[in-house]
Structure formats: structure tokens, C-alpha cells
């Protein structure tokens, strides 16, 4: 299960990783578990997959059953699908994730034969539905995606906290490592990974060509391409890295990775009094 802040590059990294794995002869299933349903867009050249939840609703109204052909699509050996979620303001995204996995089980999820199943999860939301793979030991490894900015590392740290909590409750899921995306060389993401005791699986540079090709829905993780070694390395590391129990940071520890001028870390908390609140 791959977690990260929205916009951190999870879908970009996963689309290229899954493509490279498939080209290496692995059977790969990529499942988008983000209500935005955009995990597979890069893989399919910008085209949107019909989501499992939306398709299920339409089929139910028509008195029909969902079949795998309705929701799973493939490109060059990568199988991919989107769970989907409710429309804005019309339901619970976390509950949608739970419902989506229930539908996957009806479709035979546990009987499918894949070498890797990659789950793309939004990390900003802390509700139980999005933590399902961690809470129920549904995945073998968690990977976090982040950059050299406080907000993406805040989300990565929260994911590490969730993993640590469920490990303390007897769970088995661990963090295999971190993908550093848009790496500008400032080093905060690497410092974070070291502090929480997880390895860096890959550092994808902040590069204009990568940004442009990603924006144009082009896969760069193709064997023989300029960026192929990056994703070949990532595929190897994802396969080999053992799930580890992280040591998440407290808020002050996270802020200490950055200079106070960048984060406002030198601001002091001054308690308010009742007189202050009343304007006295």
C-alpha cells in the first residue's frame, strides 16, 4: 500500500513502477484507492477508468452483476482499476474504500494470481477506511511518498504513526521505505527517512522533462529509456526491502528537519486569558 499527500506524486511513481515491473515479467495489479480516481490516468494516457463503485451502482439499478471486464483494464502487462468514491458532499470516502474492497472480494480478489498488487492511497485523510490495509493486515508493506516540504513529510509521518500504532496492537504491517519525489537536493526527505528509521527506496529528481512528460500522461519508466534505471532500481528495492517498524516523530521533531525561518518554528505559544477573550 502506497500512501502520500495529495499531489506528492504517488500516481506518477506507481504508474511508472507498475509498468517497469510488468516489463520485467511480473504480473502486476494497480488499484487506485483515492476518491479522485486518477491513479491510472497516467497509465492509460489520460483516459479515466470506470470505477468499481460507480459501475456497481449502475449495474445494481439495472439488476445486473458487475463482471471483471467492466472494471479492470490492461496495458502492456499492467492490470489496473479504480475503486472510486462518492461524489463531493454525498458520502464518506473511507466507507467507499471499504465498500470497494467488499466488491473486489466478490469478484474473486483473493483468488487472482499476481506477483504484486499495488494500492494507491490518499494519505491526507486519517479516517479508518483509508487505513484499512494497515489496520487489517491486508498489505505486506507500506511505502510512503514525499518531497522536501513540510506538508508531505507531515503526511508521511502520520502514516508511520498509524503503522506503529497497529504494530503495537499486534499487527504485522511495516514500512518498507520512502520514495522521494521532486527531489531538489535540499535533503529534508532523506533526513526524515533516517529519523523515522526507514530506507529511501528511490529519489526522483525535480526535473522539467519529467514534469512535462507526466503532465502529458507519458510513461517514463520504460526499459531502455533515459529514466529507466531509476525505476529499475525502485522495482528491485520495493521487492527486497523488508517491512520495518518505524519510529515516527513528534511535531517538534518534524519541524526540526527544517530551518525555523522556513517553517515558523521559532514562534512561541502564548496562552490567552479570559480577559483577552473578552477584549478587556
List each language-model region with its residue ranges.
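Walker A (P-loop) phosphate-binding motif
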Residues: 1-28
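Conserved catalytic-core segment of NTP-binding enzymes
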Residues: 23, 106-116, 121-212
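Conserved helicase/translocase P-loop NTPase motor core
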Residues: 95-106
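Flexible beta-alpha connector loops of hexameric P-loop NTPases
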Residues: 85-95, 150
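N-terminal phosphate/diphosphate-binding loop that engages ATP/GTP or pyrophosphate donors
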Residues: 20-80
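Short, glycine/acidic-enriched loop or turn micro-motifs at the edges of active sites
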Residues: 35-37, 85, 123, 184
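C-terminal lobe/tail of nucleotide-utilizing enzymes
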Residues: 164-280
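Residue-level signature of catalytic and energy-coupling elements of molecular machines
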Residues: 6, 39, 81, 100, ...
